[in-house]
Regions:
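Conserved beta-strand-loop-beta-strand element in the redox core of flavoprotein oxidoreductases
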Residues: 134-152
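Beta1/beta-strand and adjacent pyrophosphate-binding region of the FAD-binding site
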Residues: 7-19
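Membrane-embedded transmembrane-helix bundle of lipid-linked glycan/lipid transferases
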Residues: 14-16, 25, 30
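N-terminal Rossmann-fold NAD(P) dinucleotide-binding loop
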Residues: 22
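Flavin (FAD/FMN)-binding glycine-rich loop and adjacent Rossmann-like elements that form
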Residues: 48-50, 110, 150-157, 162-417
């Protein structure tokens, strides 16, 4: 049976994935003068920050100084101005790094993203996924599946902001997946109880008789009750595939239901309810591209200054394992950087990467996967794709000084040191 292409779109830059990185890649490309189309699998923009409920991006400041700016910060500021967040106190050295993350109202932030895409002139198509790609010397033909059928996009450049490097993998470029991926988390909120309503000892005694996974302890259960959410690590492998993602979502709900029913059996917790769950489980790690440059943990934590740095990144190495978190912090006044080469799949002419799957080792990736950094890499990829499209230049041949000029024009920080 012949499959007919229903719609044929053209663009200078096609961005696949309208999540944490992709939405700012599209806005930045459009603001740099490119005709831009943005394809998003969900019904809303924002990805992990909205659909997965991780609505507390960070870190935009390091050692008391703003290190990430531009359209992504404007989106945060507009959300604050609309009453959708309260700006935390910024200090030289906060007691806890997450105190400087900004808790955003998901509804207001999503509306701001839609508005900013409209203002920039981005052509947005939601509820669609990439299904194929063909690359020539001069352009790309990308197939997407819309609700009404298959459509094509002819674009000069493309940005993979899927979080899983799906487009890059389809195009035949090398991606890397660790033997084990970091666990995922389904965001949620529980209510209907107080800490004085139950006996901790009863929880410990009953827990010992239950058949819970070995990575879940009675102390974990008590911690969930203190923070008001079932903050569980869910084993995650192959989240870059439909089958793997399906298995992950099922396991998230099964695990959460088991804990929920256990808690409901405890005297004093009969009225406990899960009153919010995110629309999808938040994935920390899947694929990473093999890039023109690869960020190592040593380079990242020591603030190595690349000759093609495009943004700062300030978050501790934050490797989640099933039974906890392994962290390592920057020394005082040290800030990590992201090189442009880490956004370029090795030997790519027309495709860039933005977000958590940029080229990095597993430990560096555990830090640069966080949301403010993903936003900043999106901005860098958007400007680079727009400039490369305008000058008919391979992405790897783009002049670094021109990229810095474009980033400065959109308000991004470029004074790297």
């Amino acid at each position: 049976m012949e499959i007919k292409v229903k719609n044929q779109y053209t663009a200078d830059v096609a961005v696949i994935g309208g999540g944490t990185a992709g939405v700012f890649a599209a806005i930045s490309a459009a603001n740099t003068g490119a005709k831009t189309i943005l394809i998003e699998k969900n019904s809303i923009l924002g990805g992990t920050m909205t659909a997965a409920g991780v609505n507390f991006p960070g870190l935009f400041f390091a050692w008391g100084k703003k290190i990430i700016d531009g359209p992504c910060w404007k989106a945060v500021q507009r959300t604050i101005d609309l009453g959708g967040a309260v700006m935390p106190k910024i200090s030289f050295k906060p007691e806890r790094h997450w105190d400087e993350q900004i808790n955003l109202n998901k509804f207001i932030y999503t509306a701001v993203l839609f508005k900013m895409c409209d203002e920039a002139g981005v052509q947005l198509i939601c509820n669609s996924m990439v299904s194929g790609i063909t690359e020539t010397d001069k352009d790309l033909k990308i197939l997407i599946t819309e609700k009404t059928g298959m459509s094509s996009i002819t674009a000069k450049k493309a940005i993979d902001a899927t979080g899983d490097a799906n487009l890059i993998q389809m195009a035949g470029y090398e991606v890397i997946k660790g033997k084990k991926q970091q666990p995922a988390t389904l965001q949620n909120h529980i209510s209907g109880y107080s800490m004085n309503d139950f006996s901790e000892n009863e929880i410990r005694l009953k827990f010992a008789k239950e058949n819970f996974p070995e990575y879940l302890t009675a102390d974990n259960i008590l911690h969930f009750l203190r923070i008001g959410k079932l903050d569980m690590h869910i084993p995650c492998s192959n989240a870059d595939t439909s089958q793997g993602k399906t298995a992950l979502e099922k396991q998230s709900y099964f695990n959460m239901l088991k804990v929920y029913m256990f808690l409901k059996s405890i005297k004093g917790l009969e009225n406990l309810e899960i009153d919010y769950t995110a629309a999808e489980t938040g994935v920390r790690e899947s694929n990473r591209i093999a890039g023109e440059k690869t960020i190592t943990a040593e380079e990242y934590i020591n603030g190595f200054l690349y000759d093609d740095s495009v943004c700062y990144a300030f978050y501790p190495i934050d490797l989640h394992v099933m039974d906890g978190i392994k962290q390592k912090y920057h020394s005082e006044n040290v800030v990590g950087k992201i090189p442009y080469g880490a956004l370029i799949p090795k030997n790519s002419k027309h495709i860039l990467c933005a977000g958590r799957c940029i080229s990095s080792d597993i430990y560096a990736n555990s830090a640069i996967r966080v949301e403010a950094v993903c936003m900043a890499t999106g901005q860098a990829a958007g400007c680079a794709a727009a400039l490369s499209a305008h000058t008919n230049t391979d992405v790897v041949a783009l002049k670094y000084n021109k990229l810095c000029e474009a980033l400065k024009k959109i308000g991004a920080v470029t004074d790297f040191e």
